[in-house]
Amino acid sequence: VGFEAPAQAEIAEAFAWYEEKSYGLGGDFLRVIAAAAEQLARNPEAFPPTRGRFRRILLRRFPYALHFELLTNHRVSVLACLHHRRSPARWPGP
């Protein structure tokens, strides 16, 4: 599972926000991201396409989703980590 630069930036932003709210909460957020990445590595096809070739996995405990693409060699590319309240039209997209 690879994380593209925009997804990494969004994760870092969310981490900082949660850590500011409560020390340690940012670490919890990163652990949930890691658990989701493990799920994607094991069985990415368990998550059906939502828009064309893009798929998403909802994070546990946090109102975020990882938007990803399943590449032809069965690699997973995480394109975005978006809060549920953000416009779904913003990402994923071509």
Residue ranges and their predicted role:
Residues 1-30:
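Arg/Lys-rich, positively charged N-terminal/basic patches that mediate binding to nucleic acids
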Residues 22, 44-51, 85-88:
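Short, charge-rich, low-complexity interaction segments located
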Residues 35, 42-76:
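Basic/aromatic recognition patch in beta-strand/loop cores that engages polyanionic ligands
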